[in-house]
Amino acid sequence: KYFFVLFLALFESKRKNNLFFYKSKDIKLQIFRSLLSVIESGCFVLSFKYLSLANAHSIGSLAPVIVVALSAIILKEKVSAKTWIAIFIGFVGVLIILRPTSSIFDPKALLPLIAAFVLGLYQIITKKVSEHDANETSLFYTSIIGLIIMSLLASKFWTPIDGYSYAMFLGIG
């Protein structure tokens, strides 16, 4: 994933003749944003191991609600009372799915919720960095940081890919 994003960043910077695409006005924020991308992907994919696909996606779909809440808190954007009510209803829906008072509640069900929160924060920071950095700069940092982290993880957890899996990859696109 991150290798192809890096290719896209390099292609786009060449197309725009942006030779200094790797220069950021806030490199720490770009690196933090990139780490959030890796954390979000990891939490969400890991949630599939422990939850049904439907439950993981239901909980993960809270990300847009989190973005609205964070935009009010971090970006100081105005959010109407109706929107806050919708946010509250969204949280109630997730609580119904999670059933935190149930004796069968599993803390692993928090993985897609963490992923949703991290994705929301990632999107807020993306808006912040877009005020001073080009899109290809953000793509570059996301891809480099992600590629480094995932390469390190792959060296520890890699399992050989069989022919069936290759066929599935080709079928998915």
Q: For each predicted feature, which ranges?
A:
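Alpha-helical transmembrane segments of compact multi-pass small-molecule transporters, enriched
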Residues: F3-F7, I59-I73, F88, I144-I149
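Hydrophobic transmembrane alpha-helices of multi-pass small-molecule transport proteins
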Residues: K82-L98
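Hydrophobic core positions of alpha-helical segments in small-molecule transporters
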Residues: F32, I59-L62, K82-I85, Y141-T142
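Structural motif at transmembrane-helix junctions in multi-pass transporters
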Residues: C43-G60, E131-E136
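Transmembrane alpha-helical segments that form core, pore/gating elements
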Residues: A9, S103-W158, F169-G171
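C-terminal transmembrane-helix exit sites in multi-pass transporters
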Residues: L46, P64-I85, F157
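Transmembrane alpha-helices of multi-pass small-molecule transport proteins
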Residues: K1-I39, V118-L121, Y141-K156
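Loop-to-transmembrane-helix transition segments
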Residues: N18-C43, P107-A115, P160-G173
